[in-house]
Amino acid sequence: MMLTVDSVAGGYGDIQVLWGVSASVEAGHVTVILGRNGAGKTSLLNAVAGFLPTVRSGQVRLGDLELGRLTPFERVRAGLAYVQEGKRVFHRRTVEENLLLGGYTVKRPFLRRGQRLQTALDRAYERFPILADRRKMVAGRLSGGQQQMLAIAQALIPEPTVVMLDEPSAGLAPAIAKEVFAMVEGLKREGLAVLLVEQVVDNALAIADDVIVIEAGRVAASGPVSDFDDTAMVRDLYLGRGSAGLRQAPDPSDR
């Protein structure tokens, strides 16, 4: 299943933060979105998920399905998962209760079939063995890295085809962050499409197939990860000092 974002423009009320942004990711691939803080990376994910208050133009498609008129709940049902920044779990609920809550975002036939839900739980514990060991522990007692794993595992319970991750390594120790990136690479091997916003450039590029650089709400550059193997060049892109040798996105005003 391919996720396609085509020339999306929008923002928060009268404040426009995205200016004709396009992106895509296909099954079994990771597209990494890079950019400075405030560049519009999270706003792009919010637009895809249905959380951006104002979308003035453009389209978001999941396969052949146009998502523009769907609610965030309906987008999850369609196969989209979104793990927001900040280890968003229910701290007073157990690990297993958190995972079961992930099942309430899917169609009721799924919930009535206990075996399917149990299969989803088993898969979550297979992906994250540490969660299986702590299934009866309240989430608030988990480490930061374990809470992030739980947030990702919960998003995967409905068996999505596309997963969006907003800075999953934020606030994690380097060793734990590597575990999270290894998990993302595992999702790629399973055939999921992954749209990843990250600040840890080296780790992100190591698992990426394609890269998009956003600057001031516009795509500054995009291309296969092989175009971004020059660390100095990537640093310059972060600082907004150019993108020589990379494919430039067309300016929407030129259309």
Task: Give the location of each predicted region.
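Conserved ABC ATPase signature
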Residues: V138-L142
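ABC ATPase C-loop
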Residues: A155-L156
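Catalytic Walker B motif of ABC-type/P-loop ATPase nucleotide-binding domains
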Residues: V163-E167
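Conserved catalytic motifs of ABC-family nucleotide-binding domains
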Residues: E159
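ABC-type ATPase nucleotide-binding domains, specifically the catalytic core motifs of the NBD
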Residues: G13, P53, V95, L100-R116, ...
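The feature captures the beta-strand-to-loop junction immediately N-terminal to the Walker
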Residues: L34-R36
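Conserved ABC transporter NBD signature motif
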Residues: S57-L65, A78, R112, R116-L121
